[in-house]
Amino acid sequence: MSAATDGTPDATPDATGGGRPVTTPGGRPDGDPAPAAAPRASADERILHASPLRKLLSRPELGSVVGALAVLLVFAFAADGFLRASSLSTVLYASSTIGIMAVPVALLMIGGEFDLSAGVLVTSSALVSSMFSYQMTANVWVGAGVSLLVTLAIGAFNGFVLTRTGLPSFIVTLGTFLMLTGMNLGFTKLIDGTVSTKTIADMEGFPSAHAVFASTLTVGGVDFKITIVWWLGLVALASWVLLRTRTGNWIFAVGGNKDAARAVGVPVTRTRIGLYTGVALGAWISGQHLLFSYDAVQSGEGVGNELIYIIAAVIGGCLITGGYGSAVGSAVGALLFGMTSKGIVFAEWNPDWFKFFLGAMLLLATLLNAWVRKRAEAAK
């Protein structure tokens, strides 16, 4: 028999979302008559009955979607072959190489931090995998496993130093960036004698590793790189974490106000370290793709890519101040980057203009995102 029929109290959510005992017709547990339910606040009614337009305006990625459609239209008219399936495949590949890193970087920015070492960490991951496999004459999967451990340790190191010292993430990750840049070049020259690693194409395990990280899939007669699958998978996973798990709530809470989040029991330190470890995981995936695509790695690669990852996340709706953004937005930001970089080539424009367009997109997307956010807050 349910509580409603035998007169015992039943716990239902109150207006704040928690559970408290309320009475059935039999009365409250202490025998006092039940008070009349307070009317729901009008603000709650507005939220519950929000129009589709209001819900749309509240989405962080709205600005980037509008920008992506505009860029698509521009290059559709400016470049004759831009909308061909083969051209779109090229655009998606360029987008995926940025998007794999833009997703964890976006989560980190939602958590109120950013990582200047993300670009060179990709190269570090590839170098460790390549040099360990070659020097130890080991299966390349062993090298990839060692690389995973080292890369995750570097990410955790960033988070640990940040949380223990209280230093800004700019200082901590700038230091890591400089150290990794020097180590990448120094160790490669020390071990291999040049600025690039030896080829590992003929080593055991290379074909299977190439299939996982750098193969090509044919769909409908069009070739697509497997990095597109990795990218979309990470977007789906990150969106699920942000929107459907307690960890996602922690990320938004930490990015919004660390002290308030800590006061209500959010594991702030663990969340921040976990976010940096997530960036390291993305760097490992990108690093293995880099290695198994070209068989060897240049030690100076990756410098400057960290800004591209951050730009993709910001264009996608993430705020530098934290607490706002989405994984889908970062994917759209990466797509914008891919369309612009390849669209300029297809349109036969001077590629020197690429940085100009990238900066203009960043500025316009930031302004549009700020306007959308203000409209969304005003509508609540």
Positions of PLM-derived features:
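Alpha-helical transmembrane segments within multi-pass membrane transporters and channels
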Residues: 137-177, 332-333
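Transmembrane alpha-helical segments in multi-pass inner-membrane proteins
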Residues: 283-284, 293-359
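Transmembrane helix-bundle core of multi-pass membrane transporters
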Residues: 170-245, 271-274, 294-302, 377-380
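Cytosolic-side transmembrane-helix boundaries in multi-pass membrane proteins
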Residues: 2-73, 77, 256, 263-270, ...
